[in-house]
């Protein structure tokens, strides 16, 4: 492992804690919390909660990934990297970019369109049902009758899909780096 000096125990612990924090947060938000929430509250409550939590989530990811990249970069100068370390550095960098795209662009754009959709849905008595499969025909009818709603829905799903893709790419990057870190531990 190419390094410019050995990291202190504090730096090692910080690096491990930050990576673990970002990975655990991604697991919780991406694979658990949303599915539990959508099955327990109305669609509009779900959207409102997500609109408040996601900015915090994306900025925590951005900060955590940036700290991980910075710590890794300090102890792995570019001139001394082998190909494994180059891949790790690239994965940290990609994770930062993905979190940044979500925090600055995809998340806010999806939220903005969702809030417009919710206003239109309220006017038509939709959004108070629990779960996604409730009253599908009402949403289909609204899409067919209201071009503004249809446009915002299309834009929302585009940004939501891009946000999910960025989130999964970032999760993959951090997972690979966490696995690599675990495989290189001296002991547990």
Curated annotation (Swiss-Prot):
Membrane-spanning intervals of the chain: 18-38, 54-74, 86-106, 168-188
Membrane topology field: Multi-pass membrane protein
Family: Belongs to the TMEM205 family.
Entry keyword Mitochondrion: no
Primary localisation category: membrane
Localization in the cell: Membrane
InterPro entries: TMEM205, TMEM205-like
Protein's organism: Danio rerio (Zebrafish)
GO CC terms of this entry: membrane
Name the UniProt record assigns to this protein: Transmembrane protein 205
Keywords: Membrane, Transmembrane, Transmembrane helix
């Amino acid at each position: 492992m190419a390094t410019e000096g050995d990291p202190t125990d504090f730096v090692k612990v910080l690096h491990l804690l930050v990576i673990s924090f970002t990975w655990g947060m991604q697991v919780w938000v991406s694979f658990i919390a949303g599915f539990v929430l959508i099955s327990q509250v109305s669609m509009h409550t779900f959207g409102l909660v997500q609109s408040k939590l996601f900015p915090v989530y994306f900025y925590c990811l951005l900060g955590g990934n940036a700290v991980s990249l910075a710590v890794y970069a300090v102890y792995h100068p570019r001139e001394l990297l082998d190909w494994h370390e180059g891949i790790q550095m690239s994965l940290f960098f990609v994770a930062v970019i993905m979190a940044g795209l979500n925090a600055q662009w995809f998340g806010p754009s999806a939220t903005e369109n969702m809030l417009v959709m919710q206003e239109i849905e309220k006017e038509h008595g939709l959004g108070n049902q629990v779960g996604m499969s409730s009253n599908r025909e009402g949403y289909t009818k609204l899409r067919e009758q209201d071009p503004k709603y249809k446009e915002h829905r299309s834009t929302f799903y585009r940004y939501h899909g891009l946000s999910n893709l960025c989130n999964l790419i970032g999760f993959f990057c951090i997972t690979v780096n966490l696995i690599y870190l675990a495989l290189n531990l001296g002991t547990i």
